Amino acid sequence: MAERGYSFSLTTFSPSGKLVQIEYALAAVAGGAPSVGIKAANGVVLATEKKQKSILYDERSVHKVEPITKHIGLVYSGMGPDYRVLVHRARKLAQQYYLVYQEPIPTAQLVQRVASVMQEYTQSGGVRPFGVSLLICGWNEGRPYLFQSDPSGAYFAWKATAMGKNYVNGKTFLEKRYNEDLELEDAIHTAILTLKESFEGQMTEDNIEVGICNEAGFRRLTPTEVKDYLAAIA
């Protein structure tokens, strides 16, 4: 009850030491579509559920797995409009880095800068935290990277993780299946199986998205490729 008076203030701590608006933002993430990231020995895979709004909806108009540079991509759980703002900011940050240094931005540098943007929205008046968590993958210095950033601006490197709806089940499944010698092909199968743990209804190439990142760069798998992977695990 004592927390209620602080729930509308972003910049004021509650008596228990919480910023309640951040707690609400994390709740938006936990209620969002599940997403999975797995770092393999030779690349990274991102996978997420993509709900079909209507048979009239043009699914090519909006994607959940997005490239930022040739070697970095990301996915989200939470609020789609907030995600698209962060995608735009991430691309702009990557372009600014390239203009200054004439080389692609390292994955860890981009994660740090995007997380700083998210953190600024936890201590400014007249704004609210972003209602998304991001999984950011990349390839540089001859190795793969996977990071998660949450609405507070905190970020961590991961070997494999799940977020969004039923993320606890996803993480438990990954803990049983993951090993550091995993190849990218196996990681793709594992990511899809992890999504399947909490998937409602029939999983098809139209309601999930998968992205991969390796030495060749980042790309989103085509629906035909996703269909083949689904057939392989059926």
Swiss-Prot record:
Pfam families: Proteasome, Proteasome_A_N. SUPFAM superfamilies: N-terminal nucleophile aminohydrolases (Ntn hydrolases). The keyword Nucleus applies. The modification N-acetylalanine is found at residue 2. The modification Phosphotyrosine is found at residues 6, 24, 76, 121. It is found in: Cytoplasm; Nucleus. The modification Phosphoserine is found at residues 7, 14, 16. One of its GO terms (biological process) is proteasome-mediated ubiquitin-dependent protein catabolic process. This is Proteasome subunit alpha type-2. It comes from Homo sapiens. The gene is PSMA2.
